[in-house]
């Protein structure tokens, strides 16, 4: 107050106090009126220091005078007071305010007349930018426009693109210009022909109107008189520069052609602005969460584009600005009154309607203001004082509730003064001091210490209410002992506008710290030194400022030099150029949690996926979202040094016009290390204990509250593109856990667990269930105490950066939690409504099944088997599916069950768990978990797993195992079971198969329907029963086969089969034996496949043959089934093997087959090892693998394996750079043929196939079902070349897996060599060459080309070897030993060499010299010996393996 009172001293103060307020009034001016005037000037952003001098008061009067006509009474009173003060400074003798105003008017009138007289005598200056000056001869000449001005104009047009800002920019740059200069400016932007055409039309219209209103004089002109300008003369098309100068400067009859032309240009610019900015001022409305400042910016930007008079624009400002604001801001603006200034509006609405993160950040910063620093405090840098001793939680002044502040309050706003908080007056009428405790009933920082930002810094910035000291203060506790306090950097909270006192060039002033401003702009400050004029843009338009360089700015003892702009700004601003020098940072307290270190998978680099194009509205939405996230500290801008990128896109939120940002992290997820999920499932309400008090909380912005590892952030980079590549994309990276990234759930769960552990330990009576951001808090405490503990939990989370919004804070039942509805003594699932549709799609059925599965955990008897049958196979989501009668019945049954609400109860630890299981037929089961009868904790259902052959007891064991695992997870212990099976039935089955599955203890109850075994296999041969030796064989190529049996009594039955496989034939042989046998039978088979199926005692099967076998088994009294190894000389087995193999399969005989088979039976080695160790051709080795029952036991077809026969190729089309590449891959070698084709047609595909067949032997081509592959041209090419064309899934569910993998490999190589080739077709052939001949690996360590040649050569050798062996088999050998003169034989010829032969005689292989052997042809006589290789048959040829020799 002393500073303001020092405006007048001594005699001047005495004179001031003698002046009356009104004529004849007793009240006189006092010192308090000076204090009041100083404060009012600050409200109007004027310098109160100017009141100290006469010149200063005169400047204030000139500044305020234009606003008197529309100003408030307070403004008029202020102007009157300054006028009186001006008279006091000038020593004028006045008695009251009226005389002071009269004196002021007289002095000002005399000055104006003197200036007018001086102007008449001085030469006319029409412009400062383009002056028309007088030369040495006294002639008026024109000074040409400068290149710098033209450059500024062109740059403005290119940057602003005819936005509303271009009009004041044109007016500023063209001030004083003549039409010649203006046309020069327009010619400089000739690239915008569309806009200039619009401007030309406006000029023509205005010129025509000028000619109509200013007709030319009739007759010739007098000598020496210049003609009057026409419309085209004003436009500069038919006039010269000299004529334009004369018209402008010819005294009283001057015509300012330049100003007239400028008005026409402005009219055209207005039209262009309206065209380029079609948004109407009526459409500018403030969003529900949009900051008021951003809304004002958009409002005035659009207002400048409106073609209206200034009076209309003033009306729009007074009414629409308030009318179109959001409800929160509108209520505050209306409370300010109709005459509130824009500054008052922006001050009042600061933080209102903005993102809720502001309140969270500020509350977090203030709540921890005195908590983390033990034994110390942080001097908080604020505009107004605060109470460091205030205790207690944050409390809202507006609604009185704890947990938030008034600026973030959603309750209706209190009316009242924005200074003192009292109702009955507004801020402009406040007499109660500068700042009261409005919105600060309880400061957020009261009772807490701020987090320690650094170890040591300078002294505190501003004293607290108790006074400041050099880094220490006395304790205010009862002891009163002083303590040392660690010194910390100053913090400037954002509860209010961050205004500080700064010394600029030696002058003290208050300025706003504005991180959104580039420059520092001050008003009414006199700086020394040279300055340059400059124009900057602000809220109200462009303003002219003076630019001073190297000005010293001091803030709280720290100095920095920088550029300062001085001009008529409404608020003094310290911009980023000064704040950066001071070392200021904008800190958003995301979380004090230590980041979890994350790495990429070994050998992998970050994603480098290009951003795909986005529409303009999506780019604008993403820009706004990212700007807000950047302000919150969630993301940061990055430069071009980061080589990684992940594409982003935007979608509209459901039932909303707002946009949501999505990041496609699929590529990053592939490359990121794997995480262990710390939580393997969601909590179940059946496992909750019944609690007296319950609360459900939700953590707001859960992932965004956890920091991301700084070393990993670079991999999350993404780019926001610009429309038409106008500017480079804006690059960002995440500072927090991103949504959609694979590591976010695990890291957040782990971090949240660590945060909750201290609270759990200190509050053991409180039970907290945590799943992601949902928290269930239960206790048996009284409700009031329970809620206190919940508030402590919320505060605990808040200190770590996690908020729990009031909107999702559930205090009263029913509680909605994790999809469940919790009541005090029961729970249920949230209401489920099944849709009633006439037309069902696959997607509808999927959603329906999901709802029913969710309901089955409390509703008993829910069945979905028939519904699931409708969507089997690969179908489109939109494909229409007709409901079967069974599915309709099942759906209606489920509807009936869901009509009546069903509830579950809570867990009681002192009681046992029980489970009841029921069978519903067709492999469907239901179960209930309970402690008391008819009070279920949980229910569920089970459907038979994917198994071709099973029985009820096996399914029952699976149900029990499933329920047991659930019980261990939910309740931590095993329940007791009540099962629908008799003890005898179970023990009979379980005695042999106990090792198959783990089963807990149970009780056997007689609750129908009971489960029983329909047949039983004997463990020992049945004495007196007939024995059937069964076998089957099939030819892979012809699909023909035989199946049958022989008995020890000589009875036999052989049937022929068509379109069969070896496994089907084996099963058919068992079926024939069962059909032809009596009530008791022994069956012997050499097929492990058959033994495995029947010995499991299935009661149902998906295979028709197995189902028939089951039916036959149920008719028998006793059945014994055993297995014997094939081809081991077992009589009956060998006999039936010969019978079914005749004319079906042939066997290749080579040395080492027996040893290889025995070795494989021991170790089950692969065919490569057999071929290498025993010298067998690959085909023979593969046949041995195919004949192994343990290596092929799971089905009739070798699913999951690709056919690697030498003549099989896969073909597919892929796309790159908008072109089509057709690729053919040799499956066995990975050799590639590829080229670019002009179109994906059948003709081009067939032509490529012909070229492929001309180069390489192709027997089979495998493709997908694309139209180019199924075309008539492709069929014709396959027919002509004799190539078998296969579609679909012949051997592998992903039958195109080889060519798809090669497509990826080929594209990868193309990217590596792309910069070496001009055209894509060249790059494709280069990549094919690299793949085929420059990269080794895989089988044999060859290149793909070498491997292909080796395979083809091996195929030829194998074929020739087969011919040679078959030829040799037609000869027999008689031989003799060296010591025995008797000829032995005949033996089998295995090999004939130049000096010796290799023979096999009675199982022994011998090498006999050529001279001691006689070779004769076999003419069909049956050779003796049961072990002769000629009579031995193997099952191997019937197996479906590649490379079989027919």
Curated annotation (Swiss-Prot):
UniProt domain RNase H type-1: residue ranges: 1022-1145
- Ranges for the region named Interaction with host AP3D1 are 12-19
From the record, which residues define motif Tryptophan repeat motif?
Answer: 986-1002
**Keywords assigned by UniProt, alphabetized:** Activation of host caspases by virus, AIDS, Aspartyl protease, Capsid protein, DNA integration, DNA recombination, DNA-binding, DNA-directed DNA polymerase, Endonuclease, Eukaryotic host gene expression shutoff by virus, Eukaryotic host translation shutoff by virus, Host cell membrane, Host cytoplasm, Host endosome, Host gene expression shutoff by virus, Host membrane, Host nucleus, Host-virus interaction, Hydrolase, Lipid-binding, Lipoprotein, Magnesium, Membrane, Metal-binding, Modulation of host cell apoptosis by virus, Multifunctional enzyme, Myristate, Nuclease, Nucleotidyltransferase, Phosphoprotein, Protease, Repeat, RNA-binding, RNA-directed DNA polymerase, Transferase, Viral genome integration, Viral nucleoprotein, Viral penetration into host nucleus, Viral release from host cell, Virion, Virion maturation, Virus entry into host cell, Zinc, Zinc-finger
Marked site, Cis/trans isomerization of proline peptide bond, at: 219-220
Q: Where is this region: Interaction with host CALM1?
A: 8-43
Catalytic residues identified in the record: 514
Interaction with human PPIA/CYPA and NUP153, as annotated region: 187-225
What ranges does the record give for the region Interaction with membrane phosphatidylinositol 4,5-bisphosphate, renumbered to this chain? 73-77
- For this chain, the annotated S-S bridges are none
| Annotated CDD domains | HIV_retropepsin_like (cd05482)
UniProt record, GO biological process: DNA integration; DNA recombination; establishment of integrated proviral latency; proteolysis; symbiont entry into host cell; symbiont-mediated activation of host apoptosis; symbiont-mediated suppression of host gene expression; viral genome integration into host DNA
**Sites bearing Phosphotyrosine, chain numbering:** 130
UniProt site (Cleavage): 130-131, 362-363, 381-382, 437-438, 444-445, 488-489, 587-588, 1028-1029, 1148-1149
What protein name is recorded for this chain?
Gag-Pol polyprotein
Q: Which organism is it from?
A: Human immunodeficiency virus type 1 group O (isolate MVP5180) (HIV-1)
What gene, per UniProt, encodes this protein? gag-pol
């Amino acid at each position: 107050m002393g500073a303001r009172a020092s405006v007048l001293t001594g005699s001047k103060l005495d004179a001031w106090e003698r002046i009356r307020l009104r004529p004849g009034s007793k009240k006189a001016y006092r010192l308090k009126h000076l204090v009041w005037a100083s404060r009012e000037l600050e409200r109007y952003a004027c310098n109160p220091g100017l009141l100290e001098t006469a010149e200063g008061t005169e400047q204030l009067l000139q500044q305020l005078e234009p606003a008197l006509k529309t100003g408030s009474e307070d403004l008029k009173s202020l102007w009157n007071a300054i006028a009186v003060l001006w008279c006091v400074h000038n020593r004028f003798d006045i008695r009251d305010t009226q005389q002071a105003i009269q004196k002021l008017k007289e002095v000002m009138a005399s000055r104006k007349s003197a200036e007018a007289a001086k102007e008449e005598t001085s030469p006319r200056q029409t412009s400062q930018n383009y002056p028309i000056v007088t030369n040495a001869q006294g002639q008026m000449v024109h000074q040409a426009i400068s290149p710098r001005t033209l450059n500024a104009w062109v740059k403005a047009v290119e940057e602003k693109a005819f936005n509303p800002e271009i009009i004041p920019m044109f007016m500023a740059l063209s001030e004083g210009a003549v039409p010649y200069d203006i046309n020069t400016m327009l010619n400089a932007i000739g690239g915008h022909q569309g806009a200039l055409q619009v401007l030309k039309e406006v000029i023509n219209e205005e010129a025509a109107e000028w000619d109509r209103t200013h007709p030319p004089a009739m007759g010739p002109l007098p000598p020496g008189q210049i003609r009057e300008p026409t419309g085209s003369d004003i436009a500069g098309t038919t006039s010269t520069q000299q004529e334009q100068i004369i018209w402008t400067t010819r005294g009283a009859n001057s015509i300012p052609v330049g100003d007239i032309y400028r008005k026409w240009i402005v009219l055209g610019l207005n039209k262009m602005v309206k065209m380029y900015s079609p948004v109407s001022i009526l459409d500018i409305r403030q969003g529900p969460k949009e900051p008021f400042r951003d809304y004002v910016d958009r409002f005035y930007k659009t207002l400048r584009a409106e073609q209206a008079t200034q009076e209309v624009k003033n009306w729009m400002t007074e009414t629409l600005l308030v009318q179109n604001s959001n409800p929160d801001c509108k209520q505050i603006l209306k409370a300010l009154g109709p005459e509130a200034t824009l500054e008052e509006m922006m001050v009042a609405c600061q933080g209102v309607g903005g993102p809720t993160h502001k309140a969270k950040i500020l509350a977090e910063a203030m709540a921890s203001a005195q908590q983390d620093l033990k034994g110390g405090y942080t001097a908080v840098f604020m505009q107004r004082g605060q109470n460091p001793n205030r205790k207690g939680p944050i409390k809202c002044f507006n609604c009185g509730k704890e947990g938030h502040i008034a600026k973030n309050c959603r309750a209706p706003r209190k009316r009242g003064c924005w200074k003192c908080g009292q109702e009955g007056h507004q801020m402009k009428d406040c007499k109660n001091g500068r700042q009261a405790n409005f919105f600060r009933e309880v400061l957020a920082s009261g009772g807490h210490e701020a987090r320690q930002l650094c170890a040591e810094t300078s002294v505190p910035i501003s004293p607290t209410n108790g006074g400041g000291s050099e880094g220490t203060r006395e304790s205010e506790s009862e002891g009163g002992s002083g303590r040392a306090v660690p010194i910390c950097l100053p913090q400037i909270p954002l509860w209010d506008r961050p205004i500080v006192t700064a010394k600029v060039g030696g002058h003290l002033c208050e300025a706003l710290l504005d991180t959104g401003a580039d420059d520092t702009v001050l008003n009414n400050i006199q700086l020394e030194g040279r300055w340059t004029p400059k124009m900057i843009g602000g809220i109200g338009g462009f303003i002219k400022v003076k630019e001073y360089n190297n000005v010293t700015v001091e803030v709280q003892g720290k100095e920095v030099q920088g550029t300062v702009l001085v001009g008529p700004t409404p608020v003094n601003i310290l911009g980023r150029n000064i704040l950066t020098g001071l070392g200021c940072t904008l800190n958003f307290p995301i979380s004090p949690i230590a980041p979890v270190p994350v790495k990429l998978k070994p050998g992998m680099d970050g994603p480098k996926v290009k951003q795909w194009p986005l529409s303009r509205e999506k780019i604008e939405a993403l820009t706004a979202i990212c700007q807000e996230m950047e302000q919150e500290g969630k993301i940061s801008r990055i430069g071009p040094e980061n080589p990684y990128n992940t594409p982003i896109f935007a979608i509209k939120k459901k039932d909303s016009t707002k946009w949501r940002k999505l990041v496609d992290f699929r590529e990053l997820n592939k490359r990121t290390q794997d995480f262990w999920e710390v939580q393997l499932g969601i909590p179940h309400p059946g496992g909750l204990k019944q609690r007296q008090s319950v609360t459900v909380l939700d953590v707001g912005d859960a992932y965004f509250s956890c920091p991301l590892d700084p070393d990993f952030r670079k991999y999350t980079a993404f780019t926001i593109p610009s429309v038409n590549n106008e500017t480079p994309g804006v690059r960002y990276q995440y500072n927090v856990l991103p949504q959609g990234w694979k590591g976010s759930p695990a890291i957040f769960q782990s971090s949240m667990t660590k945060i909750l552990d201290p609270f759990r330990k200190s509050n053991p009576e409180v039970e907290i269930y945590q799943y992601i951001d949902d928290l269930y808090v239960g206790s048996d405490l009284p409700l009031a105490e329970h809620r206190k503990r919940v508030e402590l939990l919320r505060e605990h989370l808040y200190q770590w950066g996690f908020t729990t919004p009031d909107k999702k804070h559930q205090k009263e039942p029913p509680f909605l939690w994790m999809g469940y509805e919790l009541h005090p003594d029961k729970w249920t699932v949230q209401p489920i409504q099944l849709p009633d549709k006439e037309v069902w799609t696959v997607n509808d059925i999927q959603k329906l099944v999901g709802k029913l599965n969710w309901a089955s955990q409390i509703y008993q008897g829910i069945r979905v088997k028939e519904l699931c049958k409708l969507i089997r196979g690969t179908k489109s989501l939109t494909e229409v599916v007709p409901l079967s009668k069974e599915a309709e019945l099942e759906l209606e049954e489920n509807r009936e069950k869901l009509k009546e609400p069903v509830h579950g109860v809570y867990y009681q630890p002192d009681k046992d768990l029980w489970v009841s299981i029921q069978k519903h037929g067709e492999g469907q089961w239901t179960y209930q978990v309970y402690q008391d009868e008819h009070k279920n904790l949980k229910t569920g259902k089970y459907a038979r797993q994917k198994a071709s052959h099973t029985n009820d007891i096996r399914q029952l064991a699976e149900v029990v195992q499933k329920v047991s695992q659930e019980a261990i997870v939910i309740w931590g212990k095993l329940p007791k079971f009540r099962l629908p099976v008799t003890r005898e039935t179970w023990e009979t089955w379980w005695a042999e198969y106990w090792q198959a599955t783990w089963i807990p203890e149970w009780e056997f109850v007689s609750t129908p329907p009971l489960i029983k075994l329909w047949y039983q296999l004997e463990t020992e041969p049945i004495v007196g029963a007939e024995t059937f030796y069964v076998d089957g064989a099939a030819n892979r190529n012809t699909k023909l086969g035989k199946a049958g049996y022989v008995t020890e009594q000589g009875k036999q039955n052989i049937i022929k089969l068509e379109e069969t496989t070896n496994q089907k034939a084996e099963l058919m042989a068992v079926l024939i034996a069962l059909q032809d046998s009596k009530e008791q039978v022994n069956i012997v088979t050499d097929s492990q496949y058959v033994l495995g199926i029947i010995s499991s005692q299935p009661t149902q099967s998906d295979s028709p043959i197995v189902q028939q076998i089951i039916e036959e088994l149920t008719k028998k009294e006793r059945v014994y089934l055993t297995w014997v190894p094939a081809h081991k000389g077992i009589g009956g087995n060998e006999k039936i093997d010969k019978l079914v193999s005749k004319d079906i399969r042939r066997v290749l005989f080579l040395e080492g087959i027996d040893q290889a088979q025995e070795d494989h039976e021991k170790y089950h080695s692969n065919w490569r090892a057999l071929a290498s160790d025993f010298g067998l051709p690959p085909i023979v080795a593969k046949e041995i693998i195919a004949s192994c029952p343990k290596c092929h036991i799971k089905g009739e077809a070798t699913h999951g394996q690709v056919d690697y026969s030498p003549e099989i190729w896969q073909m597919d089309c892929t796309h790159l750079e908008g072109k089509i590449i057709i690729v053919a891959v040799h499956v066995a070698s990975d050799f590639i043929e590829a080229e670019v084709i002009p179109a994906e047609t059948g003709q081009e595909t067939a032509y490529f196939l012909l070229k492929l067949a001309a180069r390489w032997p192709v027997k089979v081509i495998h493709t997908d079902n694309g139209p180019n592959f199924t075309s008539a041209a492709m069929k014709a090419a396959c027919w002509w070349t004799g190539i078998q064309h296969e579609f679909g899934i012949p051997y592998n569910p992903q039958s195109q897996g080889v060519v798809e993998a090669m497509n990826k490999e080929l594209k990868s190589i193309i990217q590596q060599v792309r910069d070496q080739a001009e055209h894509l077709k060249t790059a494709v052939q280069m990549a094919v060459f690299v793949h085929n001949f420059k990269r080794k690996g895989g089988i044999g360590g060859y290149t793909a080309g070498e491997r292909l040649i080796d395979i083809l050569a091996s195929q030829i050798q194998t074929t020739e070897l087969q011919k040679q062996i078959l030829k040799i088999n037609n000869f027999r050998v008689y031989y003799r030993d060296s010591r025995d003169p008797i000829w032995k034989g005949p033996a089998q010829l295995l090999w004939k060499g130049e000096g010796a032969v290799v023979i096999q005689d009675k199982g022994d292989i011998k090498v006999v010299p050529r001279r001691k052997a006689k070779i004769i042809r076999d003419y069909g006589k049956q050779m003796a010996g049961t072990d002769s290789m000629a009579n031995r048959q193997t099952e191997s040829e019937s197996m479906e393996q590649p490379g079989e020799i027919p």
